[in-house]
Structures are given as structure tokens and as C-alpha cells.
Amino acid sequence: MTSETSVNLLDFDAEGLVAYCGSLGEKPFRAKQLQRWIHQYNAGDFDGMTDLAKSLREKLKGRASIVMPEIASDHVSTDGTRKWLIDVGNGNAVETVFIPEETRGTLCVSSQAGCAVNCRFCSTGKQGFSRNLSTAEIIGQLRMAEFALRASLGRAPGPNGKAERVVTNVVMMGMGEPLLNYNAVVPAMRLMLDDNAYGLSRRRVTLSTSGVVPMMDRLGAELPVALAVSLHAPNDALRDELVPLNKKHPLRELMAACQRYLKVAPRDFITFEYCMLDGVNDTEAHARELLAVTRDVPCKFNLIPFNPFPESGLIRSKPEQIKRFAQVLIDAGVVTTVRKTRGDDIDAACGQLAGAVKDRTRLAERTGAAAKIIEVRAI
């Protein structure tokens, strides 16, 4: 039985767990054993950790715990997308979304309850900011999803044979701005990359930021993973309106930070995300302006059809306009994709990550028609 003041071991990356074991008078290799039990074998208590000395297990039972986030709901979309609503206490909830594809499984992870950036097109921002998530609450989303998915597929973990993982990619693109919760996000990502935990490569962990320039530089120095930048506008005047953070870190400063990041990044390009808003940022002239502002940054574009919500006052760009916009970028030789909408029926699509969902109206009813979303790729 653990005490009310016990340490949650999910809050520790490898270095932190070594230090904690050291405080108990244990050698560093015990931390690796413990980490494998927690993150690879899904151990929920210490008694079953049979290769740990009994004396250590007794110490841990009195001083430590493995506390997972509480699942409030679990929904599966008709397209296979799975969304968990996670209760993080005091009326706050965050969401975790798994997107299955033929060759990979991507988990979208939240970093904050709410968001302070308040992008005009994002329903999460309309909730306002509640608090940062802890490292345990962030890595707990991956642990929860990985083992829930393994269980549904009959892939039981265990020390006698590590099961093939289901989550192959993680994107820090859920609720919140990850770089505004840097001190909790980075240890969680270290665990994602650690071979004694989840063993993902840096190319398979992507952090998405709205452009917190000083923290982009710090991330590049300390833990460069794949980077996506929420751009959404080709000039400062429009981006000031859509992404208020731009007033603090305008496009010239942001593009320079992207160039610096690429010197250490695991990929040789930045992904620029661009939410397609009808009559706001979606003309061919906007596309040409976008090419000009990003010309010195090796990049690819991910165009995101807007997911309407009542408070936004915005409309999704028409499919034919998205195609024309994309073609301008492709003709300039830039790899461009149009994100396929996934999980609309369970409000799991990009921009719909709001714990307190006020409007459960079907997306097709909001947009007037269920538009067929195209995907365009450079050849």
C-alpha cells in the first residue's frame, strides 16, 4: 500500500529514475529493470517485478506508485480511429486519439488541459487554458493507448517475449502547446525514445508548435525530434489574427528559427501545417505568398480541411479550392498533402479536441454536405 505522498514513477525519465533509485540506495541497473517493467510489460504493482530484489520491491511499495490517468470515455469511429477522454481532475479533461493506417499507427497526445494560444480555428483554444499536464499524464497517454490496443489485438506484453508495438508514431498535436509545457513534455518524449521504454526513433516522434521560438531553439539543443509548425497564414497581418502568438514571434523570426532547427533535426524538412479556411487564407494568391515566405526553409505542406465548430464563425474551404491551392505548391516543387479527415463522428478530428464538447451535431450537418476530401501529392 502506497502513501498519499508516494512518488509516481511515471514522472521519471531514465535519468530521473536512476536518481530516484540512487536515493533508495540502489544501483543504476535497477532503474532500467524498473523502467522495462513499467513501460514495456505494463506492470501495475511491484510484487510481480520478479527480477527486482524483494527488499527493493518492499521499499517501492512503501514510497512509490504507478498512477495512470483515469479514462472517462473510450470511443471508436467507423473509420477505426479511437479516442479516449482522460479525466485529469478538477473538472479538466484531455483527449488522446489513435489513428490506424495500413503501415503505421499514430497516437495524437495532449500536453495541456486547454490551451493559452487561442488560435481562431481551434476548438480547444476556446476552452481557455486550465493547466499543464505532468510528465506522468503525458507518457501515461501512450502507455494507456499502447496496452489497450495490444489487449484488443491479443498481443499480451511480458518479459518472456515483448509484443510487437501497435503505436509506431507519436505526434504531440493534441490539446495544448507542447513548448509551453517544456519541462514535462521533454521527459515524456525521452521515454518515448528510450529503448528500455517505447523505443521510437526521433523521426517517429513529431512535436507540433504554433511557433514558440525560444523553446524551439532549446528543443533543438536538447532533444531534436521531427518538427511541425502550425503556420496557417502566409503573412503577419493574417497570422496575427489566426494565431495570436505571431504578434510575439512574427514570421521572419519563426522562419529563422526553423532554419536553425533543421541543422540538428532528424528529418531534413519542416512540416508546415495549414488549416484551410474558406475565403480567409485559401486563394491561389495566398499559396504563392506562402511559397515566398517559406522559400528559405526546406519543407513540406500539410493542408488541413477545417473542422467547423459553432463558436468559430469559419467555414471549411471547398474541396476544389483546396485542390487548386495545393496545385500551386506542387507546381513549385514542394511536397504537399491534404490531411484526410478521421474520426469526425466521435469529434476526434484535428481542431475538435475539446474535453467539454458542447455541440454533438454531426459534421455533415454543420457543413451542409459530407464533402469528399482529396489527397494531393507531388510526383
UniProtKB/Swiss-Prot annotation:
Disulfide bonds join 108-350. GO terms for cellular component: cytoplasm. The active site is at 95 (proton acceptor), 350 (s-methylcysteine intermediate). It is found in: Cytoplasm. Transmembrane segments: none annotated. Reaction proceeds by a ping-pong mechanism involving intermediate methylation of a conserved cysteine residue. Belongs to the radical SAM superfamily. RlmN family. PANTHER family: 23S RRNA METHYLTRANSFERASE, RADICAL SAM CORE DOMAIN-CONTAINING PROTEIN. Its cofactor is [4Fe-4S] cluster. Residues 101-345 form the Radical SAM core domain. Binds 1 [4Fe-4S] cluster. The cluster is coordinated with 3 cysteines and an exchangeable S-adenosyl-L-methionine. Pfam families: Radical_SAM, RlmN_N. It catalyses: adenosine(2503) in 23S rRNA + 2 reduced [2Fe-2S]-[ferredoxin] + 2 S-adenosyl-L-methionine = 2-methyladenosine(2503) in 23S rRNA + 5'-deoxyadenosine + L-methionine + 2 oxidized [2Fe-2S]-[ferredoxin] + S-adenosyl-L-homocysteine; adenosine(37) in tRNA + 2 reduced [2Fe-2S]-[ferredoxin] + 2 S-adenosyl-L-methionine = 2-methyladenosine(37) in tRNA + 5'-deoxyadenosine + L-methionine + 2 oxidized [2Fe-2S]-[ferredoxin] + S-adenosyl-L-homocysteine. It is an enzyme of class 2 (transferase). InterPro entries: Aldolase_TIM, Methyltransferase_A, RlmN_N, RNA_MTrfase_RlmN, rRNA_lsu_MTrfase_RlmN/Cfr, rSAM. Its EC number is 2.1.1.192. The gene is rlmN. S-adenosyl-L-methionine binds at residues 176-177, 208, 230-232, 307. This is Dual-specificity RNA methyltransferase RlmN. Its main location: cytoplasm. It comes from the Bacteria. [4Fe-4S] cluster binds at residues 115, 119, 122.
